[in-house]
Amino acid sequence: MKPWYVLLGTAIVAIGGIFAYCATRAADGPALASSARIDLARYMGAWYVIANIPYFAERGKVATRDVYALDADGNVATTYVYRKSFDDPEKTMGSLGIVQPGSNNAYWIVRFLWLIRADYLILEVAPDYAWALVGQPSRKLGWVHARDPAMDDAQYRDLLGKFAAFGYDTSRFARVPQFREQVGRAGFQ
């Protein structure tokens, strides 16, 4: 009989491989690219997750944000902050974004536990860095980020229109509750 830690390690690698395949496999149509030029120093800091295409790791979370910090090697240390409900304490998950050369800082390979790899593509950022649209070349996942946790409906619709111009099916996006009164409202997770 194999020790339990060998079986656990094998299971983690297998699950990581499945996730990496699902997160990076191409969608129908040409792969998405970005022409954005990102000033990494301005991009660092807290970004609230206003909306996303829900998937297992973020589905059902509330009051979420990503906090980015540039490390000495030029990589981006990321802390995902979330709550399972507004009554629960904050929890965090960490990852490392490796900025890809020649991408104008817009394309990162993100590693979770060094086993799982995902694409991170900054499609567009506001001139004042108040919001950012983030996706993947496959268009499987997407996020609306903002420096402020509150975003009015008109601006949100405008940003979804930008995602549509990038070839996304915007009906797949759902807003993330940042405030207790948003829970259960139409259009929110």
What are these language model-derived features?
Residues 2-189:
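A beta-rich soluble binding module of mature secreted/lumenal proteins
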